[in-house]
Swiss-Prot record:
PTM sites of type Omega-N-methylarginine: 157
Family annotation (Pfam families): RRM_1
Protein name: U1 small nuclear ribonucleoprotein A
Keyword annotations: Acetylation, Methylation, mRNA processing, mRNA splicing, Nucleus, Repeat, Ribonucleoprotein, RNA-binding, Spliceosome
Record GO terms (molecular function): identical protein binding; RNA binding; U1 snRNA binding; U1 snRNP binding
Organism classification: Eukaryota, Metazoa, Chordata, Craniata, Vertebrata
Region (Disordered): 106-134
Organism: Mus musculus (Mouse)
GO cellular component: nucleoplasm; spliceosomal complex; U1 snRNP; U4/U6 x U5 tri-snRNP complex
Amino acid sequence: MATIATMPVPETRANHTIYINNLNEKIKKDELKKSLYAIFSQFGQILDILVSRIMKMRGQAFVIFKEVTSATNALRSMQGFPFYDKPMRIQYAKTDSDIIAKMKGTYVERDRKREKRKPKSQETPAAKKAVQGGAAAPVVGAVQPVPGMPPMPQAPRIMHHMPGQPPYMPPPGMIPPPGLAPGQIPPGAMPPQQLMPGQMPPAQPLSENPPNHILFLTNLPEETNELMLSMLFNQFPGFKEVRLVPGRHDIAFVEFDNEVQAGAARDALQGFKITQNNAMKISFAKK
Protein backbone atom coordinates (compact mmCIF):
# COMPACT_ATOMS: atom_id res chain seq x y z
CA MET A 1 0.00 0.00 0.00
CA ALA A 2 1.37 3.37 -0.99
CA THR A 3 2.59 5.62 1.78
CA ILE A 4 0.55 8.79 2.24
CA ALA A 5 2.65 11.88 2.84
CA THR A 6 1.08 13.86 5.65
CA MET A 7 2.07 15.73 8.78
CA PRO A 8 1.60 13.92 12.11
CA VAL A 9 -1.86 14.52 13.54
CA PRO A 10 -1.66 16.16 16.98
CA GLU A 11 -3.57 14.60 19.86
CA THR A 12 -7.01 16.15 20.30
CA ARG A 13 -9.33 15.83 23.28
CA ALA A 14 -12.23 13.41 23.02
CA ASN A 15 -15.17 14.88 21.15
CA HIS A 16 -18.69 13.89 20.12
CA THR A 17 -17.56 14.44 16.54
CA ILE A 18 -14.98 12.50 14.56
CA TYR A 19 -13.22 13.98 11.55
CA ILE A 20 -12.51 11.59 8.68
CA ASN A 21 -10.25 12.22 5.70
CA ASN A 22 -8.55 10.26 2.94
CA LEU A 23 -12.01 9.34 1.65
CA ASN A 24 -12.55 8.44 -1.99
CA GLU A 25 -13.28 11.76 -3.72
CA LYS A 26 -15.14 10.11 -6.59
CA ILE A 27 -18.05 9.06 -4.39
CA LYS A 28 -21.10 11.32 -4.63
CA LYS A 29 -22.12 13.25 -1.52
CA ASP A 30 -25.42 11.48 -0.87
CA GLU A 31 -23.93 8.03 -1.42
CA LEU A 32 -20.99 8.87 0.85
CA LYS A 33 -23.27 10.00 3.68
CA LYS A 34 -25.40 6.89 3.32
CA SER A 35 -22.35 4.61 3.37
CA LEU A 36 -20.83 6.35 6.40
CA TYR A 37 -24.07 5.98 8.29
CA ALA A 38 -24.25 2.28 7.44
CA ILE A 39 -20.83 1.49 8.96
CA PHE A 40 -20.79 3.94 11.89
CA SER A 41 -24.35 3.60 13.24
CA GLN A 42 -23.36 0.38 15.03
CA PHE A 43 -21.35 2.45 17.54
CA GLY A 44 -24.23 4.58 18.78
CA GLN A 45 -26.81 7.19 17.85
CA ILE A 46 -25.65 9.50 15.06
CA LEU A 47 -26.98 13.06 15.18
CA ASP A 48 -25.67 14.12 11.79
CA ILE A 49 -23.12 13.44 9.08
CA LEU A 50 -21.54 16.45 7.37
CA VAL A 51 -20.06 16.21 3.90
CA SER A 52 -19.16 19.38 2.01
CA ARG A 53 -19.70 20.02 -1.70
CA ILE A 54 -16.74 22.42 -1.72
CA MET A 55 -13.91 21.12 -3.89
CA LYS A 56 -11.22 21.80 -1.25
CA MET A 57 -13.18 19.76 1.30
CA ARG A 58 -13.59 16.70 -0.91
CA GLY A 59 -12.51 13.45 0.68
CA GLN A 60 -13.44 14.67 4.17
CA ALA A 61 -16.44 14.19 6.44
CA PHE A 62 -17.65 14.66 10.01
CA VAL A 63 -19.73 12.12 11.92
CA ILE A 64 -21.48 13.56 14.98
CA PHE A 65 -22.46 11.12 17.72
CA LYS A 66 -24.79 11.80 20.62
CA GLU A 67 -22.30 10.27 23.08
CA VAL A 68 -18.54 10.81 23.32
CA THR A 69 -18.03 7.12 24.07
CA SER A 70 -19.63 6.24 20.75
CA ALA A 71 -17.21 8.53 18.93
CA THR A 72 -14.27 7.01 20.82
CA ASN A 73 -15.28 3.44 19.97
CA ALA A 74 -15.80 4.38 16.34
CA LEU A 75 -12.41 6.07 16.11
CA ARG A 76 -10.56 3.13 17.64
CA SER A 77 -12.41 0.40 15.77
CA MET A 78 -12.53 1.97 12.30
CA GLN A 79 -9.09 3.63 12.11
CA GLY A 80 -7.54 2.51 8.82
CA PHE A 81 -10.70 0.69 7.70
CA PRO A 82 -10.64 0.20 3.88
CA PHE A 83 -13.58 2.32 2.76
CA TYR A 84 -14.13 2.41 -1.01
CA ASP A 85 -10.58 1.10 -1.52
CA LYS A 86 -8.93 3.77 0.67
CA PRO A 87 -8.02 3.45 4.38
CA MET A 88 -9.87 5.99 6.49
CA ARG A 89 -7.88 8.40 8.67
CA ILE A 90 -9.91 9.37 11.72
CA GLN A 91 -9.36 11.84 14.55
CA TYR A 92 -11.51 13.81 16.94
CA ALA A 93 -12.79 17.13 15.61
CA LYS A 94 -10.91 20.08 17.13
CA THR A 95 -14.08 21.87 18.22
CA ASP A 96 -17.66 20.97 19.04
CA SER A 97 -20.04 20.83 16.11
CA ASP A 98 -22.89 23.34 16.04
CA ILE A 99 -25.48 20.76 17.07
CA ILE A 100 -23.42 19.69 20.11
CA ALA A 101 -22.60 23.30 21.04
CA LYS A 102 -26.32 24.10 21.02
CA MET A 103 -26.99 21.11 23.28
CA LYS A 104 -24.31 22.35 25.69
CA GLY A 105 -25.45 25.96 25.46
CA THR A 106 -22.06 27.13 24.15
CA TYR A 107 -23.06 27.86 20.55
CA VAL A 108 -21.75 31.13 19.07
CA GLU A 109 -22.71 32.47 15.66
CA ARG A 110 -19.79 31.73 13.36
CA ASP A 111 -20.24 34.76 11.10
CA ARG A 112 -19.89 37.17 14.03
CA LYS A 113 -16.65 35.52 15.09
CA ARG A 114 -15.28 35.82 11.55
CA GLU A 115 -16.17 39.50 11.34
CA LYS A 116 -14.42 40.31 14.64
CA ARG A 117 -11.36 38.29 13.74
CA LYS A 118 -10.84 39.44 10.17
CA PRO A 119 -10.52 43.16 9.14
CA LYS A 120 -12.81 44.17 6.30
CA SER A 121 -9.84 45.41 4.28
CA GLN A 122 -8.55 41.83 4.00
CA GLU A 123 -11.80 40.33 2.81
CA THR A 124 -11.90 39.45 -0.86
CA PRO A 125 -15.14 39.49 -2.87
CA ALA A 126 -15.12 35.69 -2.81
CA ALA A 127 -14.72 35.65 0.97
CA LYS A 128 -17.56 38.15 1.43
CA LYS A 129 -19.78 36.02 -0.77
CA ALA A 130 -18.95 32.93 1.28
CA VAL A 131 -19.78 34.72 4.54
CA GLN A 132 -23.07 36.01 3.17
CA GLY A 133 -23.96 32.55 1.97
CA GLY A 134 -23.26 31.04 5.37
CA ALA A 135 -20.37 28.85 4.20
CA ALA A 136 -16.82 29.05 5.50
CA ALA A 137 -14.19 29.67 2.84
CA PRO A 138 -11.84 26.68 2.53
CA VAL A 139 -8.19 27.11 3.44
CA VAL A 140 -5.87 25.98 0.67
CA GLY A 141 -3.98 22.83 1.62
CA ALA A 142 -5.72 22.50 4.99
CA VAL A 143 -6.81 19.06 6.09
CA GLN A 144 -8.20 20.02 9.48
CA PRO A 145 -11.84 21.14 9.80
CA VAL A 146 -12.73 24.82 9.81
CA PRO A 147 -13.07 25.94 13.47
CA GLY A 148 -16.56 25.24 14.68
CA MET A 149 -17.15 22.76 11.83
CA PRO A 150 -17.94 23.74 8.24
CA PRO A 151 -21.44 25.26 7.98
CA MET A 152 -23.52 22.93 5.90
CA PRO A 153 -27.27 22.32 5.89
CA GLN A 154 -28.28 19.32 7.92
CA ALA A 155 -29.54 16.43 5.86
CA PRO A 156 -31.39 13.32 6.93
CA ARG A 157 -29.14 10.44 7.87
CA ILE A 158 -31.00 8.04 5.59
CA MET A 159 -31.05 8.99 1.93
CA HIS A 160 -33.29 7.67 -0.82
CA HIS A 161 -32.07 4.59 -2.63
CA MET A 162 -29.57 5.45 -5.34
CA PRO A 163 -29.24 3.43 -8.55
CA GLY A 164 -26.26 1.11 -8.80
CA GLN A 165 -24.15 -0.33 -6.05
CA PRO A 166 -20.98 0.97 -4.41
CA PRO A 167 -17.69 -0.88 -4.92
CA TYR A 168 -16.29 -3.49 -2.56
CA MET A 169 -16.51 -2.47 1.08
CA PRO A 170 -16.14 -5.17 3.75
CA PRO A 171 -18.33 -4.74 6.83
CA PRO A 172 -16.81 -3.77 10.20
CA GLY A 173 -15.13 -6.70 11.87
CA MET A 174 -14.09 -8.60 8.73
CA ILE A 175 -10.85 -6.65 8.36
CA PRO A 176 -9.18 -5.79 11.69
CA PRO A 177 -7.87 -2.26 12.33
CA PRO A 178 -4.08 -1.81 12.35
CA GLY A 179 -2.42 -3.62 15.26
CA LEU A 180 -5.14 -6.22 15.71
CA ALA A 181 -4.82 -9.81 14.61
CA PRO A 182 -7.54 -11.35 12.42
CA GLY A 183 -10.44 -12.47 14.59
CA GLN A 184 -9.43 -10.22 17.52
CA ILE A 185 -12.26 -8.01 18.76
CA PRO A 186 -11.34 -4.28 18.52
CA PRO A 187 -11.93 -2.01 21.55
CA GLY A 188 -15.60 -1.10 21.87
CA ALA A 189 -16.76 -3.77 19.41
CA MET A 190 -18.83 -6.78 20.32
CA PRO A 191 -18.68 -10.38 19.07
CA PRO A 192 -21.48 -11.05 16.56
CA GLN A 193 -23.55 -13.23 18.89
CA GLN A 194 -23.02 -11.20 22.10
CA LEU A 195 -26.25 -9.50 23.06
CA MET A 196 -26.88 -6.13 24.65
CA PRO A 197 -29.31 -5.92 27.62
CA GLY A 198 -32.87 -6.02 26.33
CA GLN A 199 -31.93 -7.53 22.97
CA MET A 200 -33.75 -10.47 21.50
CA PRO A 201 -32.39 -13.99 22.16
CA PRO A 202 -30.07 -15.66 19.63
CA ALA A 203 -31.48 -16.81 16.33
CA GLN A 204 -32.67 -20.37 15.87
CA PRO A 205 -30.07 -22.93 14.72
CA LEU A 206 -28.91 -22.29 11.18
CA SER A 207 -29.95 -25.80 10.14
CA GLU A 208 -33.63 -25.03 10.77
CA ASN A 209 -34.30 -24.69 7.03
CA PRO A 210 -32.50 -26.64 4.29
CA PRO A 211 -29.88 -24.74 2.25
CA ASN A 212 -31.29 -22.27 -0.22
CA HIS A 213 -29.83 -19.70 -2.62
CA ILE A 214 -32.11 -17.11 -0.98
CA LEU A 215 -31.41 -15.77 2.51
CA PHE A 216 -34.06 -14.50 4.92
CA LEU A 217 -33.02 -11.55 7.12
CA THR A 218 -34.79 -10.57 10.35
CA ASN A 219 -34.35 -8.11 13.24
CA LEU A 220 -33.53 -5.26 10.86
CA PRO A 221 -33.82 -1.66 12.15
CA GLU A 222 -36.41 0.75 10.84
CA GLU A 223 -33.88 2.73 8.79
CA THR A 224 -32.83 -0.31 6.75
CA ASN A 225 -33.09 0.10 3.00
CA GLU A 226 -32.00 -1.70 -0.15
CA LEU A 227 -28.73 0.20 -0.59
CA MET A 228 -27.60 -0.46 2.98
CA LEU A 229 -28.09 -4.21 2.62
CA SER A 230 -26.53 -4.27 -0.84
CA MET A 231 -23.40 -2.67 0.61
CA LEU A 232 -23.07 -5.57 3.04
CA PHE A 233 -23.83 -8.45 0.71
CA ASN A 234 -22.48 -7.40 -2.69
CA GLN A 235 -18.91 -8.20 -1.63
CA PHE A 236 -19.72 -11.92 -1.67
CA PRO A 237 -19.49 -13.94 -4.90
CA GLY A 238 -22.80 -14.73 -6.54
CA PHE A 239 -24.75 -11.82 -5.05
CA LYS A 240 -27.77 -11.00 -7.21
CA GLU A 241 -30.20 -8.70 -5.41
CA VAL A 242 -31.89 -7.54 -2.22
CA ARG A 243 -35.66 -7.68 -1.95
CA LEU A 244 -37.51 -5.71 0.71
CA VAL A 245 -41.01 -6.56 1.91
CA PRO A 246 -43.50 -3.68 1.46
CA GLY A 247 -44.80 -2.50 4.80
CA ARG A 248 -42.18 -4.46 6.78
CA HIS A 249 -38.90 -2.74 7.65
CA ASP A 250 -37.63 -5.57 9.84
CA ILE A 251 -37.28 -8.34 7.25
CA ALA A 252 -35.72 -8.76 3.80
CA PHE A 253 -34.55 -11.37 1.31
CA VAL A 254 -31.12 -11.60 -0.35
CA GLU A 255 -30.64 -13.78 -3.42
CA PHE A 256 -27.42 -15.47 -4.59
CA ASP A 257 -26.60 -17.63 -7.60
CA ASN A 258 -26.41 -20.84 -5.56
CA GLU A 259 -26.76 -22.29 -2.07
CA VAL A 260 -23.02 -22.46 -1.36
CA GLN A 261 -22.52 -18.74 -2.04
CA ALA A 262 -25.58 -17.87 0.04
CA GLY A 263 -24.26 -19.99 2.91
CA ALA A 264 -20.88 -18.24 2.86
CA ALA A 265 -22.53 -14.82 3.11
CA ARG A 266 -24.85 -16.05 5.87
CA ASP A 267 -21.98 -17.37 7.98
CA ALA A 268 -19.88 -14.20 7.52
CA LEU A 269 -22.62 -11.69 8.36
CA GLN A 270 -24.59 -13.65 10.95
CA GLY A 271 -25.18 -11.31 13.90
CA PHE A 272 -23.79 -8.23 12.13
CA LYS A 273 -24.92 -5.17 14.12
CA ILE A 274 -26.49 -2.76 11.65
CA THR A 275 -27.22 -0.50 14.61
CA GLN A 276 -26.15 -0.72 18.24
CA ASN A 277 -29.26 -2.67 19.22
CA ASN A 278 -30.05 -4.63 16.06
CA ALA A 279 -27.99 -7.75 15.43
CA MET A 280 -29.05 -9.07 12.03
CA LYS A 281 -30.36 -12.65 11.99
CA ILE A 282 -29.85 -14.64 8.81
CA SER A 283 -31.34 -17.99 7.82
CA PHE A 284 -32.04 -19.84 4.60
CA ALA A 285 -35.43 -18.90 3.18
CA LYS A 286 -38.06 -21.62 3.11
CA LYS A 287 -38.38 -23.37 -0.25
